[in-house]
């Protein structure tokens, strides 16, 4: 077992009693329990003061520790205070989809309403709101897209930007946009807004996509003043200065959280394998510590599933009376019904061990946690604009993140945090996480700003300005894709069409081109599959069987055509079963088919949902969904025309050179083309591990590049 040494004791004052777990109770008792829980939250004692502060201040910053109740209770306080009169809504944004969904479900339960009525959520490819929704939880990116259709966000009286400390790229841009919207909401509405000629630029639900249309949302407000917009910024970080300064000295109020003392323990020496050290520490706690659930922070789905499997295996090798340990996972790609399991009490006598990504730092509160295991790492996005290379890397967490993690052990009673690194390593960590806007590809966000009529991107009022190089690279990429004209404004109609689709710009352009190549059906399927976790299931204990099954679907021409084969074959299977009268058990039958074919049923189901949603979007634009049937040459040419910025050519030594960046890259072992070594390919993902790998490949003819993207390639002499 890792050797643990007692480090500095971090003590926090707690002013509320913990909430004990309860067995299953009657509906009346459940309502009573919920009411008692709400009254016990730290924020309940300051309800009146908070409502008064919102009434007095158009901008308010609320700093409250995770578990204080700010996310679930403040919107209800404001609703009860009359902020939703005349049909207005309170919008609450989250940087993560899972938080928007779980919190909305909890608030609907507290309000005793069906989800989608008074309380609803809206995330990409999933909307439960209705005309009666007044408390709307959503991702920050979703609200940004909503601003394209309603530049004044006229339906909202209050916008609450939650988890602002997360500093996601969408949160940062949204705050800048809301700063402008607040000013324009105090002026009479006209077609000319501070964002430019937005009302006439953005198309609404018309099927005529050949030019900009008048925005119908604002027609009823022409020449009138809208009511002021209240903006509340909520953060779990005690340092709110960056937000206060950005909003001209906005007032900040603090809500005390529930916090018991947490003992911080460090390893004596660095751990060479933190996954193994995590596993050992889980069982050390289980055998030696008092009752209480364990929360483990891991970097992603692969690590979580690996540790979950290893815990299950080791449980089989210990005495039966010691096996009462229940491993549960929570990460964004997990279906919501499985995510909900972490919030339920463990069976009597069992200890839960929750395996989570950094979503559990602040976005959600899991009851029952007394022990935290923190290996000290997080998966973070990075971007090199000079090479156009974006990667997801495992990096050390920041001090702010590790403090948030430790705090999770002290919500309901004294706890312990096991940091799997020496104390001296903690002192070397960065104070806070670098804002995402400084380490990501900006093409998608710039496309949305352009659609809002904001053309001066360099001069835009970002909280933290991205590098000039990153902005220039994104503008060049959008110009190459045909989204921007030579003057830097949105190209008509392509730029407007691309901004309407809730996808990365390169995927939006792929769908537009597929309409011209008469293979829109095939591209819709491909984009849907590329938008989910791996569609293939590859269990370690049955790797050979999984490989054989994958070969059944594999196309010699590449991964995209292989994905198409899986999707089509599953479609054919479904149609046959429906024709045979098996419609009632279709989900169960589909899961069985997926298991037999080593296909990830969750990913396939998600891809189907995304396909349906994107299809609706392209039909609204005015496209007819045509199919090229078995003409894969047309489809591959469309792939080349769409993804020409990610083309790679084989070199004499067998490696590949990415044509756009000049980087030496290798075909990833999971590709069906791994051993084929084709001359030229397009790819969708470049990732850095031990080597620079390209994933999701299809073979193309190199001559197609200069033919289909002549503005970007010149034929070699």
Swiss-Prot record:
Coiled coil: none annotated. GO terms for molecular function: ATP binding; ATP hydrolysis activity; nucleic acid binding; RNA helicase activity. Residues 1-29 are annotated as: Disordered. Keywords: ATP-binding, Helicase, Hydrolase, mRNA processing, mRNA splicing, Nucleotide-binding, Nucleus, Spliceosome, Transit peptide. ATP binds at residues 64-71. Residues 12-29 have a biased composition (Polar residues). One of its GO terms (biological process) is regulation of RNA splicing. Changing residue 295 to P: In rid1-1; Reduced efficiency of pre-mRNA splicing. One of its GO terms (cellular component) is nucleolus. It comes from the Eukaryota. Residues 51-256 form the Helicase ATP-binding domain. It catalyses: ATP + H2O = ADP + phosphate + H(+). Widely expressed but spatially and temporally regulated during development. The keyword Nucleus applies. SMART domains: AAA, DEXDc, HA2, HELICc. Disruption phenotype: Defects in female gametophyte development. Pfam families: DEAD, HA2_C, HA2_N, Helicase_C, OB_NTP_bind. A motif (DEAH box) lies at residues 162-165. It is found in: Nucleus; Nucleus, Nucleolus. Its EC number is 3.6.4.13. The keyword Transit peptide applies. Involved in pre-mRNA splicing. Plays a role during development in processes such as meristem maintenance, leaf morphogenesis and root morphogenesis. Belongs to the DEAD box helicase family. DEAH subfamily. PRP22 sub-subfamily. This is Pre-mRNA-splicing factor ATP-dependent RNA helicase DEAH10. It comes from Arabidopsis thaliana.
């Amino acid at each position: 077992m890792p050797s643990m040494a007692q480090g500095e004791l971090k003590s926090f004052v707690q002013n509320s009693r913990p909430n004990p777990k309860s067995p299953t109770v009657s509906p009346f008792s459940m309502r009573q329990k919920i009411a008692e829980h709400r009254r016990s939250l730290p924020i309940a004692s300051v309800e009146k003061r908070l409502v008064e502060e919102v009434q007095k201040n158009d901008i308010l910053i609320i700093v409250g520790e995770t578990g204080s109740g700010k996310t679930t209770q403040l919107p209800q306080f404001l609703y009860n205070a009359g902020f939703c009169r005349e049909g207005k809504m309170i919008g609450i944004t989250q940087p993560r989809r899972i938080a928007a969904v779980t919190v909305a479900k909890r608030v609907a339960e507290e309000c005793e309403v069906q989800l989608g009525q008074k309380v609803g959520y809206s995330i990409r490819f999933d909307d439960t709101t209705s005309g009666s929704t007044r408390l709307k939880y959503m991702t920050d990116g979703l609200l940004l897209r909503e601003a394209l259709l309603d530049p004044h966000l006229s339906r909202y009286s209050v916008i609450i930007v939650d988890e602002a400390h997360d500093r996601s790229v969408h949160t940062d841009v949204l705050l800048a946009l809301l700063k402008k919207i607040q000013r324009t909401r105090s002026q009479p509405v006209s077609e000319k807004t501070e964002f430019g000629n937005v009302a006439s630029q953005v198309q609404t639900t018309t099927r005529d996509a050949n030019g900009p249309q008048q925005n119908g949302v604002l027609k009823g407000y022409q020449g009138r003043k809208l009511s002021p917009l209240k903006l509340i910024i909520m953060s779990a970080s005690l340092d709110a200065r960056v937000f206060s300064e950005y909003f001209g000295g906005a007032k900040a109020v603090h809500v005390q959280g529930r916090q018991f003392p947490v003992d911080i323990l460090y390893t004596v020496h660095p751990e060479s394998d933190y996954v193994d050290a995590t596993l050992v520490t889980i069982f050390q706690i289980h055998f030696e510590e008092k009752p209480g659930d364990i929360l483990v922070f891991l970097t992603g789905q692969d690590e979580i599933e690996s540790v979950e499997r290893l815990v299950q295996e080791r449980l089989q090798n210990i005495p039966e009376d010691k096996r009462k340990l229940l491993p549960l996972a929570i990460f964004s790609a997990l279906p919501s019904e499985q995510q909900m399991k972490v919030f339920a009490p463990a069976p009597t006598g069992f200890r839960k061990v929750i395996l989570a990504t950094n979503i559990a730092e602040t976005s959600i509160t899991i009851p029952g946690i007394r022990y935290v295991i923190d290996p000290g790492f997080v998966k973070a996005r990075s971007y090199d604009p000079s090479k156009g290379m974006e990667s997801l890397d495992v990096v050390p967490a920041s001090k702010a993140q590790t403090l948030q993690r430790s705090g999770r052990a002290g919500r309901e009673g004294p706890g312990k945090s096991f940091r799997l690194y020496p104390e001296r390593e903690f002192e070397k960590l960065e104070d806070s996480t670098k804002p995402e806007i400084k380490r990501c590809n900006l093409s998608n966000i710039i496309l949305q700003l352009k659609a809002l009529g904001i053309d001066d991107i360099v001069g835009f009022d970002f909280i933290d300005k991205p590098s000039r190089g990153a902005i220039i690279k994104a503008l060049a990429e959008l110009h190459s894709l045909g989204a921007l004209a030579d003057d830097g404004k949105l190209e008509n109609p392509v730029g407007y069409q691309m901004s309407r689709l809730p996808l990365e710009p390169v995927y939006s352009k792929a769908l537009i081109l597929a309409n011209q190549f008469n293979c829109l059906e095939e591209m819709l399927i491909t984009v849907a599959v590329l938008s989910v976790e791996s569609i293939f299931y590859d269990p370690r204990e049955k790797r050979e069987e999984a490989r054989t099954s994958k070969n059944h679907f594999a196309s010699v021409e590449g991964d995209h055509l292989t994905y198409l084969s899986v999707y089509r074959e599953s479609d054919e299977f479904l149609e046959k079963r429906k024709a045979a009268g098996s419609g009632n058990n279709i989900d169960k039958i589909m899961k069985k088919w997926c298991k037999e074919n080593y296909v990830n049923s969750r990913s396939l189901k998600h891809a189907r949902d995304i396909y349906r949603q994107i299809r609706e979007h392209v039909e609204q634009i005015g496209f007819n969904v045509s199919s090229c049937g078995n003409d894969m040459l047309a489809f591959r040419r469309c792939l080349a025309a769409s993804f020409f910025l990610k083309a790679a050519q084989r070199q004499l030594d067998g490696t590949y050179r990415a044509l756009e960046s000049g980087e030496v890259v290798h075909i990833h072992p999971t590709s069906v083309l791994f051993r084929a070594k084709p001359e030229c390919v397009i790819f969708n993902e470049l990732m850095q591990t031990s080597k620079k790998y390209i994933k999701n490949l299809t073979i193309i003819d190199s001559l197609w590049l200069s033919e289909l993207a002549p503005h970007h390639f010149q034929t070699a002499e």
